[in-house]
């Protein structure tokens, strides 16, 4: 619990004007990340519930965030935000040369947090009523179906006024983007048709898998499952327990992906230092050679604490083993003022100086989901989400 309290302080690295999450601890102070802020919103709820902050403090912070997102000076495109925003002015900060407009996936992570917050801040007082009203406005303004590029049976990741559809990145499964389709189907105002899910998301050469790795069958995704953040970002709100659709049992998918990632680290085919039963977890993070999406197919010797820690609902015993190892064996090299640093490579004797919002947020939220299911229960209780899941043919205990 002490550790969780320390990690929770990570949220104090919020931007003073917007209340949103800064992208990283060692970067430009005005860059806030929309996806990481969605995770931050969920972490704020956890903080209030655990008593790290009062409910009133959490509500004030939440109000600051939704006021900023609703402000006419904060850029959005058909109701969808950019990946990076200036936390002072609300202006878009380009993520890459052509990526200077809407980012549908990052915005989906934001809405995952906002809909959970809508359900959490349910008191009949001025501040919480205002929070709910502003979240409803944002939710109703988001034009999910615009991102079918004029009615195609697939969602596109980016659009900008300057570059139109030139990024041309179709969102297909299976990866971290599942929540994007769920929310798009759940929209009360600009929903996608179910065919967009079935012919877009599920129609990809790396969607169905079914092969065995280390004797573990992987239902969906690329070989070995890819980086572990695929099991975190969409499923911080979306509860995979008992969640099934026409294609997969998502509880099975999350567990298999996690156990395969760990088994690969134990096998350690590249012979990196440190890998083993207690030291495992490959996912996207900083590394000694820069940022990379680490996974069995892209293994650079970098272990990222968020990989094992955020997988605690899927493999609690192994996750806690890793947590103990990181804390007790690596100690001060890895533990700092905001909890565990982003990553380390023992072969290169390298420890990240940084903390990233998209890596810290899931740790807090997934530990809470493991303990009480708090964020899962909130998100899954939203009536629009339930309608969307029903529309796409999902089965979940929440629909009974």
Where are these regions (language model features)?
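Ser/Thr/Asn(+Pro)-rich, low-complexity disordered segments
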Residues: 2-400
């Amino acid at each position: 619990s002490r550790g969780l309290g320390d990690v929770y302080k990570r949220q104090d690295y919020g931007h003073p004007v917007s209340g949103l999450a800064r992208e990283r601890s060692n970067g430009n102070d005005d860059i806030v990340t929309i996806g990481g802020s969605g995770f931050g919103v969920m972490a704020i709820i956890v903080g209030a519930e655990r008593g790290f902050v009062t409910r009133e403090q959490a509500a004030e912070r939440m109000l600051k965030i939704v006021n900023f997102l609703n402000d006419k000076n904060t850029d959005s495109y058909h109701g969808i935000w950019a990946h990076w925003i200036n936390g002072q002015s609300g202006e878009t900060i380009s993520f890459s040369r052509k990526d200077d407009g809407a980012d549908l996936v990052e915005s989906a992570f934001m809405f995952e947090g906002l809909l959970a917050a809508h359900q959490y801040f349910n008191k009949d007082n001025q501040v919480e009523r205002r929070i709910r009203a502003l979240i409803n406005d944002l939710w109703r303004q988001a034009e999910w179906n615009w991102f079918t590029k004029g009615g195609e049976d697939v969602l596109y990741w980016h659009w900008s006024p300057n570059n139109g559809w030139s990024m041309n990145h179709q969102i297909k499964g299976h990866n971290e983007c599942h929540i994007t389709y769920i929310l798009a189907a759940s929209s009360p105002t600009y929903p996608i048709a179910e065919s967009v899910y079935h012919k877009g998301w599920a129609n990809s050469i790396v969607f169905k898998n079914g092969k065995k790795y280390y004797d573990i069958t992987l239902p969906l995704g690329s070989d070995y499952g890819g980086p572990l953040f695929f099991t975190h970002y969409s499923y911080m709100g979306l509860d995979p327990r008992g969640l099934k659709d026409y294609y997969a049992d998502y509880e099975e998918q999350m567990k298999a992906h996690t156990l395969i990632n760990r088994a690969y680290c134990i096998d350690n085919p590249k012979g990196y230092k440190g890998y083993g039963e207690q030291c495992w977890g490959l996912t996207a993070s900083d590394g000694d050679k820069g940022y990379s999406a680490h996974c069995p197919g892209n293994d650079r010797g970098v272990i990222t604490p968020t990989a094992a820690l955020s997988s605690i609902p899927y493999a609690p015993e192994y996750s806690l083993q890793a947590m103990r190892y990181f804390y007790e064996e690596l100690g001060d090299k890895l533990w700092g003022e905001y909890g565990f640093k982003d990553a380390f490579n023992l072969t290169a004797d390298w420890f990240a100086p940084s903390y990233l919002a998209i890596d810290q947020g899931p740790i807090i939220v997934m530990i809470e989901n493991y303990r009480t299911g708090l964020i899962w229960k909130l998100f899954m209780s939203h009536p629009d989400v339930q309608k969307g899941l029903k529309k796409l043919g999902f089965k979940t205990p929440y629909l009974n």
